[in-house]
Amino acid sequence: MSMSDPIGDMLTRIRNAGRAKHETCLVPGSKIKKSILDLMKEEGFIKDYESVKVNETFEDYKVFLKYDHTKRPIIRELVRVSTPGRRVYIKSAEIRPYKNNIGTLIVSTSKGIMTGKNARKLKLGGEVILKMS
């Protein structure tokens, strides 16, 4: 059976691994997931990720999760905003700081996938993929 929301599945895997206090989790690979993981690493929500070859055509990403000094996950909230059944778009003027700049919006724009902060600076709107804090 095919997966209807691969990005939502990736977020759920990361969220569940964090709650179970796992050091890593494995997510199926794609270009958009790689872009999202790059932004999560850049914003400090994950330590790192690496590509793992499944076979000649498919690859997975091994995500290294990040925890604070009390062993609580750094990612407190990881929510899919725009789903395949309900797309959510936002204009650049409507992009506001999320959770008083503690959280981050990930937006898919015409210039690629970027944080809400960068999209606002470049005056680009787009589809709100997820929000995290």
UniProtKB/Swiss-Prot annotation:
Gene3D superfamilies (UniProt xref): 3.30.1370.30, 3.30.1490.10
SUPFAM superfamilies with a match to the protein in the record: Ribosomal protein S8 (SSF56047)
Pfam families listed in its UniProt record: Ribosomal_S8 (PF00410)
Keywords on record: Ribonucleoprotein, Ribosomal protein, RNA-binding, rRNA-binding
Family matches, as InterPro entries: Ribosomal_uS8, Ribosomal_uS8_CS, Ribosomal_uS8_sf
One of the record's GO molecular function terms: structural constituent of ribosome
Domain of life: Bacteria
Cellular component per GO, a single term: ribonucleoprotein complex
GO biological process, one term: translation
Family the UniProt entry places it in: Belongs to the universal ribosomal protein uS8 family.
Subunit and partners: Part of the 30S ribosomal subunit. Contacts proteins S5 and S12.
Functional note: One of the primary rRNA binding proteins, it binds directly to 16S rRNA central domain where it helps coordinate assembly of the platform of the 30S subunit.
Entry-linked NCBIfam families: PRK00136.1
Stated name of the protein: Small ribosomal subunit protein uS8
